[in-house]
């Protein structure tokens, strides 16, 4: 029944009601985003409402280089979303955002450092495989992972050649001060020296 309404009427309804979910009920309606007068971050809306099927559809449109992508995908907003999902560790969403064009290298590889800080090893590995630099910002990733006791992240970073002794064994001391014995033990086994205060 709804698909019997002319597109012009749908545009008026959406503009009046401000309900973008009306455009998400049908793939044909989705293209009406080009015509509506609503300023909204559709990617953020789709993710917040856990509409993964819609996100899949947007990714498919991106791969097809559909012109609607230019209206609904704004790189700055993608980058903001990417940081948020690196904090929460949602690898599935991180992958979608990268496919849609989020810049994993922005702000000295902030997203990989954020994932390290929060202990999301699978997100870290994915971002590194996509070209993120775990040594950016003076090897900050290992300091953040050590400080928060994320042993698996620390082990991964060391295996990738991150310099954990760069600042007079700062990482091991921070891990020790925060009570992360397993990180301390690992770094000592790799040659770090714990400095007493």
UniProtKB/Swiss-Prot annotation:
Q: Which InterPro entries match?
A: Ankyrin_rpt, Ankyrin_rpt-contain_sf
ANK-type repeats, residues: 78-106, 107-136, 138-166, 168-196
Gene3D superfamilies the record matches: Ankyrin repeat-containing domain
Q: Which UniProt keywords apply?
A: ANK repeat, Repeat
PANTHER family named among the record's database cross-references: SURFACE ANTIGEN BSPA-LIKE (PTHR44207:SF1), SURFACE ANTIGEN BSPA-LIKE-RELATED (PTHR44207)
Keyword Repeat listed: yes
Q: Short name of one Pfam family for this protein?
A: Ank_2
- The scientific name of the source species is Acanthamoeba polyphaga mimivirus
* Protein name as it appears in the record: Putative ankyrin repeat protein R875
């Amino acid at each position: 029944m709804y698909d019997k309404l002319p597109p012009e009427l749908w545009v008026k309804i959406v503009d009046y009601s401000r309900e973008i979910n009306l455009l998400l009920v049908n793939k044909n309606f989705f293209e009406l985003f080009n015509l509506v007068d609503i300023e909204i971050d559709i990617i953020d809306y789709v993710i917040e409402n856990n509409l993964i099927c819609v996100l899949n559809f947007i990714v498919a449109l991106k791969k097809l280089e559909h012109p609607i992508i230019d209206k609904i995908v704004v790189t700055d907003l993608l980058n903001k979303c990417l940081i948020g999902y690196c904090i929460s560790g949602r690898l599935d969403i991180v992958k979608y955002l990268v496919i849609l064009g989020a810049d994993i290298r922005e702000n000295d590889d902030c997203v990989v450092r954020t994932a390290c800080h929060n202990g999301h090893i699978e997100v870290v590995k994915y971002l590194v495989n996509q070209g993120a630099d775990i040594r950016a910002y003076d090897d900050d990733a290992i300091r953040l992972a050590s400080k928060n006791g994320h042993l698996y992240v620390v082990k991964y970073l060391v295996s990738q050649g991150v310099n954990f002794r760069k600042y007079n064994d700062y990482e091991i001391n921070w891990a020790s001060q925060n009570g992360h014995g397993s990180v301390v033990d690992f770094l000592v086994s790799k040659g770090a020296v714990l400095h007493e205060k």
